[in-house]
């Protein structure tokens, strides 16, 4: 491999990673602004005009601080897990059409599901490597919650594949040209949205970070740079899940607008959906753990299985009918 090829690959990778990281940084500012206005206060408004430079100031502050590691922790895993969390969070973006994917995979949805399952390891290892009971309990909660809700996410994706007829994410744009899939499969969309909240450990499903019980959950021993990496990974996953929701159910190719407007339309919809995540955080109290599991295993799982059977059987049933 020549030097020019390596350079071009590096530039391509950075050109898709840096905008995601910038968007994630400003999502934290949007969150603080929305929460502050909902609580009748101003929020960040000192650093830069209207507080716009606050995320940059926070990032600089965190990365120049000295990282502290507990003396009894596992040194290698303790440092590796935040890096792994951010690396996985950025890698999952590769097959998403924005409007063109970084890598056009035939099994894009399967890749997304497999990579999002791997994020469980970073949570579990961080809790175990910290050698703290609070961190370990938080990590075990996160693992149980994430694995549980991935079941419904996978079944909903399977139903969506039945509707679109392909695992490729680009096909969903063509499928949704006449009508958004949200109209034909709104129960799936509602369950998908709630499952993405649980998958990203956001309120009201933030059982892993219950301040009154576990101080800060799996990342309680992390400070400075490693904590910032976990923070970036969490918000990158939120944006990823919202982008995937838009791609699956509210694809930007509605009424075939010019391709130049695709990215703007997608970004606007993702921002609105991310704002609804923050609105829910400000509005709802935290679920009890048994309620969280009850919602999935006794409500969502039977419903999603029934919907999946419905979406599978309908094309087969209609295939035997004579043409009108």
From Swiss-Prot:
Organism: Coturnix japonica (Japanese quail)
Transmembrane segments: 10-30, 76-96, 107-127, 143-163, 178-198, 229-249, 260-280, 300-320
Name of the coding gene: MT-ND1
Keyword hit for Nucleotide-binding: no
GO cellular component, one term: mitochondrial inner membrane
EC number: 7.1.1.2
Protein name in the entry: NADH-ubiquinone oxidoreductase chain 1
Annotated membrane topology: Multi-pass membrane protein
InterPro entries per the UniProt record, alphabetical: NADH_UbQ_OxRdtase_su1/FPO (IPR001694), NADH_UbQ_OxRdtase_su1_CS (IPR018086)
């Amino acid at each position: 491999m020549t030097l020019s090829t390596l350079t071009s690959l590096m530039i391509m990778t950075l050109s898709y990673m840096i905008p995601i990281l910038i968007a994630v940084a400003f999502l934290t500012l949007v969150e603080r602004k929305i929460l502050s206005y909902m609580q009748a206060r101003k929020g960040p408004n000192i650093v830069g005009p209207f507080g716009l430079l606050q995320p940059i100031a926070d990032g600089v502050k965190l990365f120049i601080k000295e990282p502290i590691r507990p003396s009894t922790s596992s040194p290698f895993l303790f440092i590796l897990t935040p890096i792994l969390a951010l690396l996985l969070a950025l890698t999952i973006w590769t097959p998403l059409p924005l409007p063109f994917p970084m890598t056009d995979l035939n099994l894009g949805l399967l890749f997304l599901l497999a990579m999002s399952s791997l994020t469980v390891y970073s949570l579990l290892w961080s809790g175990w490597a910290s050698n703290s009971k609070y961190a370990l309990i938080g990590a075990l909660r996160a693992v149980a919650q994430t694995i549980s809700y991935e079941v419904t996410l996978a079944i909903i994706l399977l139903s969506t594949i039945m509707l679109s007829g392909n695992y490729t994410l680009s096909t969903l744009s063509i499928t949704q040209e006449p009508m958004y899939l949200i109209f034909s499969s709104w129960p799936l969309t509602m369950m998908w949205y709630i499952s993405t909240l649980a998958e990203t450990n956001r309120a009201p499903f933030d059982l892993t970070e219950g301040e009154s019980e576990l101080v800060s959950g799996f990342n309680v021993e992390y400070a400075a740079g490693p904590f910032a990496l976990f923070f970036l990974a969490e918000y990158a996953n939120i944006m990823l899940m919202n982008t995937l929701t838009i791609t699956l159910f509210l694809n930007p190719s509605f009424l075939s607008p010019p391709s130049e407007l695709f990215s703007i339309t997608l970004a606007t919809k993702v921002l609105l959906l991310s704002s609804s995540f923050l609105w829910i955080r400000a509005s709802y109290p935290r679920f009890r753990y048994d309620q969280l599991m009850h919602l999935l295993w006794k409500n969502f799982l039977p419903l999603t299985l029934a919907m999946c059977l419905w979406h599978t059987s309908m094309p087969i049933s209609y295939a035997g009918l004579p043409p009108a």
